[in-house]
Amino acid sequence: MTSTLFFKPRPSSTLAEIAALTKAELIDPSQGDRVITGIASLDEAGPMHLGFFENLNYVAELEQTCAGACLVTQRHESRVPSHVAVLRVKSPVRAFVTYARHIHEDAMRPMSGFRSVGIAPSAVIHATARLEDGVIVDPLAVIGPEVEIGAGSVIGAGSVIASGVKIGRDCNVGANTTIQFALIGNNVLIHPGCHIGQDGFRFIFAQTHQKVPQVGRVIIQNDVEIGSGTTVDRGGLRDTVIGEGTKIDNQVQVGHNVTIGRHCVIAAQCGLAGSLTLGDNVALGAKVGVNNHVTIGDGAQITAMSAVKDSVPAGERWGGFFAKPTKQWFREIIAVERLLRSGAGAAPKSDDGKDGERG
């Protein structure tokens, strides 16, 4: 539920205004002056809320909703209760997001946790650091020597920006984040508790496990978003690179020397081992593990909880443990299930009729 305690209320909108913004058709134009004050899910919506319907799993919620208006496809508009104004649109969820972004700009990026303006008195900023106009630094943040931070950026409480780091304009660094040995572009969102630029896990394994110096950097290009608790190791010799527009979920590990292409999507708890390469527009489901030194080609997709030990060609869908093309993986699963149902997979019987021992 949207709370005015956390998100500032925006001016109300008429249904005619919403239809124009979302490129929807208001089925009953006489309701064009009807006022909507917010958004909500169908089961929580009231008469002043806008909702949307797209998934048949939520038919019951639609039939019982108290929403004032609903975005819906032509195919499903007959399911909308008579008291709910109908906004016909090709993609209800996209239209809903368009309106949500319009009225809740404050929810698009993490802002100052203290609603601060300027630099908090308890922040520590080195004399050689250079901050452009409009930078916000929350309490107890530390900005090191030779750091550069662009206009409109926000540094959250308790964060540490180490010596020489460059952060572009309109960036947000969440509370309790550490950044070192990194160059960061514009409009980058780093959520709370991230650690970027620490050395990678690289040793010459012997009785004493000799540590290998990691002297590379982390390069984060424009419009990247990094979820809470994610760690990005700096490169050993070459840089760790996260490409433009890539979105990374919470608790992802990015190893040293990893190269992630543009506009990739990486879901929670993925582990990317050192020196691997993701092409552009790659999608990894949650808890995917990728082996070191492999390449996943442009546009490839990996199913959640898969383990990738071999390179994946561009545009293919792989899954499983170990990952393989999904059609092959599904065929193997079906074959095993058939064997089990037929009894072919049962343990052999010994001469006395008891199950044979398994070594």
From Swiss-Prot:
Record NCBIfam families: lipid_A_lpxD, PRK00892.1
HAMAP family, per database record: LpxD
Gene: lpxD
Organism per entry: Rhodopseudomonas palustris (strain BisB5)
Family matches, as PANTHER family: UDP-3-O-ACYLGLUCOSAMINE N-ACYLTRANSFERASE, UDP-3-O-ACYLGLUCOSAMINE N-ACYLTRANSFERASE 1, MITOCHONDRIAL-RELATED
Record's protein name: UDP-3-O-acylglucosamine N-acyltransferase
Entry EC no(s): 2.3.1.191
Lineage start: Bacteria, Pseudomonadati, Pseudomonadota, Alphaproteobacteria, Hyphomicrobiales
Purpose of the protein: Catalyzes the N-acylation of UDP-3-O-acylglucosamine using 3-hydroxyacyl-ACP as the acyl donor. Is involved in the biosynthesis of lipid A, a phosphorylated glycolipid that anchors the lipopolysaccharide to the outer membrane of the cell.
Pathway entry: Bacterial outer membrane biogenesis; LPS lipid A biosynthesis
Pfam families: Hexapep (PF00132), Hexapep_2 (PF14602), LpxD (PF04613)
PROSITE patterns the UniProt entry points to: HEXAPEP_TRANSFERASES
Record's GO cellular component terms: membrane
GO biological process, one term: lipid A biosynthetic process
Single Gene Ontology MF annotation: N-acyltransferase activity
InterPro entries reported in the protein's UniProt record: Hexapep, Hexapep_transf_CS, LpxD, Trimer_LpxA-like_sf, UDP_GlcNAc_AcTrfase_non-rep
Family label: Belongs to the transferase hexapeptide repeat family. LpxD subfamily.
Subunit: Homotrimer.
Active-site annotation: 256
Catalytic activities: a UDP-3-O-[(3R)-3-hydroxyacyl]-alpha-D-glucosamine + a (3R)-hydroxyacyl-[ACP] = a UDP-2-N,3-O-bis[(3R)-3-hydroxyacyl]-alpha-D-glucosamine + holo-[ACP] + H(+)
Keywords, alphabetical: Acyltransferase, Lipid A biosynthesis, Lipid biosynthesis, Lipid metabolism, Repeat, Transferase
Key word Repeat present: yes
